[in-house]
Swiss-Prot record:
Homodimer. ATP binds at residue 336. This is Methionine--tRNA ligase. InterPro entries: aa-tRNA-synth_I_CS (IPR001412), Anticodon_Met (IPR041872), Met-tRNA-synth_bsu_C (IPR004495), Met-tRNA_ligase_1 (IPR023458), Met-tRNA_synth (IPR014758), Methionyl/Leucyl_tRNA_Synth (IPR015413), MetRS_core (IPR033911), MetRS_Zn (IPR029038). The lineage of its organism: Bacteria, Pseudomonadati, Pseudomonadota, Gammaproteobacteria, Enterobacterales. One of its GO terms (cellular component) is cytosol. A motif ('KMSKS' region) lies at residues 333-337. The gene is metG.
Length: 677
C-alpha cells in the first residue's frame, strides 16, 4: 500500500419518498459512487450509506390521495428507489429510511441534548392556516413572491432564485398549495433551535478550509445578514416523529432528515453486529472522515443547521460537504412536455448505466457548476471515447493473441518506457479522482488512450501478422496493446463497473490500482467477446418519446385543465345561493401604480358603482380595450382593504394564470345589475 488506510463514511442526500428517481438525482449518486469506488480501490475502509427521506406533509397528502397509508407508500417507494440505484450500480453498503426506530431514537436523543443544553426555545407564533383544509401549512405548501428578491412562485421556506430563507408569513401574496385559498393567521406554540448561538463556531468551521470556496462565500453572506432561530416543530396532522412530551407537535422533516445519515449507519452497524463502529464514527473526537455529497439547493441546511445540531448535541461535524450543481438536458431545464424529464428506470430501458456514468463523470469537477446532458453530444462522446478509443484498443489486439498464441501474452514488454508513462500517470489521475476533478481525470485517461492507439497504428500488427518469421514481434506488439488497455481500464474502473467486470473476465485478472506496476507477462487471457456496443440517436429518440408517453399515462385519468385544477369538494345548493353573481359593465380600466399584476376596474351594476382590483394585468396589457365590455362579478363579497385601496368585489375569469386569463362575459342582451343564476 502506498498510503495509510482511512475510515470514511460517505452519504448522498436522501431522496424524498414521494416520487421516482430521475436523471437529476443520478448526477449526485453517480458522483459519490465514483469517488467511493476509487477510495475502495486504494484500500480505504469506506461505508457508503443513504436512505429515503420519508416524512412530511407532502407524503401524508399523497398517501391520502392514493388511498393508502403513508407507511405503505414509503415502503413501495423505497423498493423502487433501491431498484433504480442498483440498476446504476450505486454501491451502497446500506439503504434505509428516516421512518425507522434508529432514526426516531437518534432524533429524540439529539433534541433532548439540545434542550438540556439550552438550545431549544419555545414561543407562540402566528402561522399560516388553510381555512378550507383545516390545517396549518408547512413551508413548502405555501407559495408566493420572495420578500428578498421579489421572484414570484417561491416556496414558503426558501427562494430557489436568490437562496434566501425566510418565514412563510414573510411571503408576498401567499397562497395555499393544497387548496389555492389565501391562508389566514393562527397562533400556535412552536419549538426553535437557537442557531445564532453557534455563529462563532460555524464561522470558524467555514474558514477552516473544510468547504468549497463557493459554499464558504455564500455562507459568509448569510453570516453578514444574521442567523435566525430555526423552527423545528410542526403541528398535527403531520407524518413524522412526535416530539417527546409535546402531544400534537412533530419534528420538522428537516430536523430528522439529516439525522437519517446517522440512522442508516446505525442500522448498518446493527446488521453487522458491530456495536462500536457507530460511536467510533460519530463521537466528537472521531478520527474517521465524514463526507456529504449534496446539491446546491440544500447547502443552507447542511452547512448551518446540521453542523450546529451536531455540535450542540455532542457529536462530530462533517469533514466536508461536496456540493454539485443542477442537471439540464439539451441546455434547458428538464421538461416533461419535451420528454427530457427522464426517470432512472426509463433510461435503463434504453441505455446501459455505464454510458450515463461516463458522461456525467467526464463533465464533473469540484466546482458547483450545472451539468448539461446534451443527448447528441452524449452519443458522440460515448462512441468516441468508450468504443473507439478504449474498447477498440482491446479488440484490435485480442484477436491475434487468441488465434495465434492461444491467449498467452508475451514474456516481456515491447516498450517498457511507454508502459512506465502509463503507470506514472497514476499519481495525476489518482489526485484528480481524490479531489473530485473528474473531468480532468477523464481527459488524462483519454490522452493515454490516444497514445496507446497511436502505438498500435505505428506498429501495425495486421501487417506484421502477414510477414514470415515475425510471430514474436506480433505477440509483443499485441501484448503491449492489451497491457496498455489494462492500465486504462484500471483507471476507469470507478466509472464503468459493468464494463470493468467484462474486462476482468477477458483479462483473467482483477483490475487493481496497486497491480498496474506489474504488467501481465506470460499471462493467459480468455477468449475475447464484444465488450461494449455503439449507441445511436435512434435510442435517444426512443428514450425521449418513452418519457413523453409516461407523462401522458400519468395524466390519463384526468386530462385538460382538470389535471392542474381539480374540482373542489361538493357544496350544497344553499352554499351556492349565498354567492350573489351580477352582470357588470366595465366603465373604466387602468393600471395600478406600484403593481405589475393588478388592474383597477370601475364597474357599473346598473345604478351602483364598484371599485375592483383584479390580478389580470398579464393577460390584458391594454386596459382600455376592456372599457365597454360586460363581465360577471361577485357582488356580495366583503370589501377587502389593499395597499392600493379598497376592492369591492371580484370579477370572474378562467384560465391557469399569466397570459392565459380569460375574463368571463355574459351573452348578448344581459344588462348591468342582472343576477346570474
Amino acid at each position: 500500500m502506498t498510503q495509510v488506510a482511512k475510515k470514511i463514511l460517505v452519504t448522498c442526500a436522501l431522496p424524498y419518498a414521494n416520487g421516482s428517481i430521475h436523471l437529476g438525482h443520478m448526477l449526485e449518486h453517480i458522483q459519490a459512487d465514483v469517488w467511493v469506488r476509487y477510495q475502495r480501490m486504494r484500500g480505504h475502509q469506506v461505508n457508503f450509506i443513504c436512505a429515503d427521506d420519508a416524512h412530511g406533509t407532502p407524503i401524508m397528502l399523497k398517501a391520502q390521495q392514493l388511498g393508502i397509508t403513508p407507511e405503505q407508500m414509503i415502503g413501495e417507494m423505497s423498493q423502487e428507489h433501491q431498484t433504480d440505484f442498483a440498476g446504476f450500480n450505486i454501491s451502497y453498503d446500506n439503504y434505509h429510511s428516516t421512518h425507522s426506530e434508529e432514526n426516531r431514537e437518534l432524533s429524540e436523543l439529539i433534541y433532548t441534548r439540545l434542550k438540556e443544553n439550552g438550545f431549544i426555545k419555545n414561543r407562540t407564533i402566528s402561522q399560516l392556516y388553510d381555512p378550507e383544509k383545516g390545517m396549518f401549512l408547512p413551508d413548502r405548501f405555501v407559495k408566493g413572491t420572495c420578500p428578498k428578491c421579489k421572484s414570484p412562485d417561491q416556496y414558503g421556506d426558501n427562494c430557489e432564485v436568490c437562496g434566501a430563507t425566510y418565514s412563510p408569513t414573510e411571503l408576498i401574496e401567499p397562497k395555499s398549495v393544497v387548496s389555492g385559498a389565501t391562508p389566514v393567521m393562527r397562533d400556535s406554540e412552536h419549538f426553535f433551535f437557537d442557531l445564532p448561538s453557534f455563529s462563532e463556531m460555524l464561522q470558524a468551521w467555514t474558514r477552516s478550509g473544510a468547504l468549497q470556496e463557493q459554499v464558504a462565500n455564500k455562507m459568509q453572506e448569510w453570516f453578514e445578514s444574521g442567523l435566525q432561530q430555526w423552527d423545528i416543530s410542526r403541528d398535527a396532522p403531520y407524518f413524522g416523529f412526535e416530539i417527546p412530551n409535546a402531544p400534537g407537535k412533530f419534528f420538522y422533516v428537516w430536523l430528522d432528515a439529516p439525522i437519517g445519515y446517522m440512522g442508516s449507519f446505525k442500522n448498518l452497524c446493527n446488521k453487522r453486529g458491530d456495536l462500536t463502529s457507530f460511536d467510533d464514527y460519530w463521537k466528537k473526537d472521531s478520527d474517521a472522515e465524514l463526507y456529504h455529497f449534496i446539491g446546491k439547493d440544500i447547502v443552507y441546511f447542511h452547512s448551518l443547521f446540521w453542523p450546529a445540531m451536531l455540535e450542540g448535541s455532542g457529536f462530530r461535524k462533517p469533514t466536508n460537504l461536496f456540493v454539485h450543481g443542477y442537471v439540464t438536458v439539451n441546455g434547458a431545464k428538464m421538461s416533461k412536455s419535451r420528454g427530457t424529464f427522464i426517470k432512472a428506470s426509463t433510461w435503463l430501458n434504453h441505455f446501459d448505466a455505464d454510458s450515463l456514468r461516463y458522461y456525467y463523470t467526464a463533465k464533473l469537477s469540484s466546482r458547483i457548476d450545472d451539468i448539461d446532458l446534451n443527448l447528441e453530444d452524449f452519443v458522440q462522446r460515448v462512441n468516441a471515447d468508450i468504443v473507439n478509443k478504449v474498447v477498440n484498443l482491446a479488440s484490435r489486439n485480442a484477436g491475434f493473441i487468441n488465434k495465434r498464441f492461444d491467449g498467452v501474452l508475451a514474456a516481456e514488454l515491447a516498450d517498457p518506457a511507454l508502459y512506465k508513462t502509463f503507470t506514472d500517470a497514476a499519481a495525476v489521475i489518482g489526485e484528480a479522482w481524490e479531489s473530485r476533478e473528474f473531468g480532468k481525470a477523464i481527459r488524462e485517461i483519454m490522452a493515454l488512450a490516444d497514445m496507446a492507439n497511436r502505438y498500435v497504428d505505428e506498429q501495425a500488427p495486421w501487417v506484421v501478422a502477414k510477414q514470415e518469421g515475425r510471430d514474436a514481434d506480433l505477440q509483443a506488439i499485441c501484448s503491449m496493446g492489451i497491457n496498455l488497455f489494462r492500465v486504462l481500464m484500471t483507471y476507469l474502473k470507478p466509472v464503468l463497473p459493468t464494463l470493468s467486470e467484462r474486462v476482468e473476465a477477458f483479462l483473467n485478472t482483477e483490475l487493481s490500482w496497486d497491480a498496474i506496476a506489474q504488467p501481465l507477462l506470460g499471462h493467459k487471457v480468455n477468449a475475447f467477446k464484444a465488450l461494449y456496443n455503439r449507441i445511436d440517436m435512434k435510442q435517444v429518440d426512443a428514450l425521449v418519446e418513452a418519457s413523453k408517453e409516461e407523462v401522458k399515462a400519468a395524466a390519463a385519468p384526468v386530462t385538460g385543465p382538470l389535471a392542474d385544477d381539480p374540482i373542489q369538494e361538493t357544496i350544497t345548493f344553499d352554499d351556492f345561493a349565498k354567492v350573489d353573481l351580477r352582470v357588470a359593465l366595465i366603465e373604466n380600466a387602468e393600471f395600478v401604480e406600484g403593481s405589475d399584476k393588478l388592474l383597477r376596474l370601475t364597474l357599473d351594476l346598473g345604478g351602483e358603482k364598484r371599485n375592483v382590483f383584479s390580478g389580470i394585468r398579464s393577460a390584458y396589457p391594454d386596459p382600455q380595450a376592456l372599457i365597454g365590455r360586460h363581465t360577471v362579478m361577485v357582488a356580495n363579497l366583503a370589501p377587502r382593504k389593499m395597499r392600493f385601496g379598497i376592492s369591492e368585489g371580484m370579477v370572474m375569469a378562467a384560465g391557469p394564470g399569466g397570459k392565459d386569463i380569460f375574463l368571463l362575459s355574459p351573452d348578448d342582451g344581459a344588462k348591468p345589475g342582472q343576477q346570474v343564476k
